[in-house]
Amino acid sequence: MYIKHFTLITLVVAMITLTTACKRERTTYDGPNYILFSAESYDLGVIDNEEWFDIPITATRSCGYDRQIGVEVLANKSNAIARRHYEVESNTLTIPAGKLTTSLRIRGIADNISVADSLGIALRLILDEEDVWNAYGTEASVILHKCCPVDLDAFTGYAKITSTWTMQYMNADARLVRTRKDAEAENTIIVEDMYYDGYDVRLKFLTEDRLNPAIEMEEQVIGSTGEAFGTIYGDGKLLMTTPAGYSNYYSSCERYVLQYVTMYVANVGTVGTYVNIFEWISDDEAERIMREGF
């Protein structure tokens, strides 16, 4: 299961159980009973048709009896379609006696969601008026995002790089390269001769967060200043690093990488920041490019 949300649980828990630093006895929350979603919004990374996601619902007090609550989908605020893009397991939920939480279960239908979609589901709790915490209300939003499993093989072979570096310094809008897995580093590929012959570059795919498929790159030498600029600067090494404040990411569904890089020469200065877009292509397309060019 994969879900991201901005949580209110910390606040609710703080209200439910209070402790004092100077006394041994435990002081418990004895205020009104409220029921609410644990967050205002949730982002679900839908990777198949089988995975169920839990949308937590929290009460501020436990009771000695089961509590039935309802959840409705607000069709006028939703663009996701029930039974086409998602399924709700049940709109009627129970907070068991003595408990504080329950969950609405939602299953995304990946086959009917495209990568470009941002499908929203607006939810509202059906509660008695005295159970509504007006400061937070009864509504929450769920966004369905299409994700794909990470297959490093999809990022090996021929790739086309469209690069502002090659446009400015190599008189080329794009460059054809080959990539392969790094046998010594997990989830890492090697881009052979990325800009200049003999200078390979390693890119690491971060796979822990399917909603944030990021790329990491350590500082690397990617060429000589003589080859890049026609003269020697500093120690003659052209270095490439990842600039702060930029997002470098990949798409497993679409087989591309977007990468920002900063070029510099040690003890001399920064050349600039540039963008690379890697698009993996078939062997047939690569052969056509080698024959005819871009």
Could you tell me what each predicted segment is?
Residues M1, C22, G245-Y246:
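Absolute protein N-terminus
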Residues V13-A14:
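Repetitive helical segments and hydrophobic/amphipathic motifs
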Residues C147-F294:
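Ser/Thr/Gly/Pro-rich, low-complexity flexible regions
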Residues M1-I9:
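Bacterial N-terminal signal peptides that target proteins for export
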Residues K23-S103, R107-T162, R288-F294:
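Acidic/polar, low-complexity intrinsically disordered N-terminal segments immediately downstream
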Residues T17-A21:
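C-terminal motif of bacterial Sec signal peptides marking the signal peptidase cleavage site
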Residues I9-T10, F205:
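Intrinsically disordered, low-complexity segments enriched in polar/charged small residues
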Residues I3, T28, I121-L123, V191, ...:
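Intrinsically disordered, low-complexity peptide-like regions
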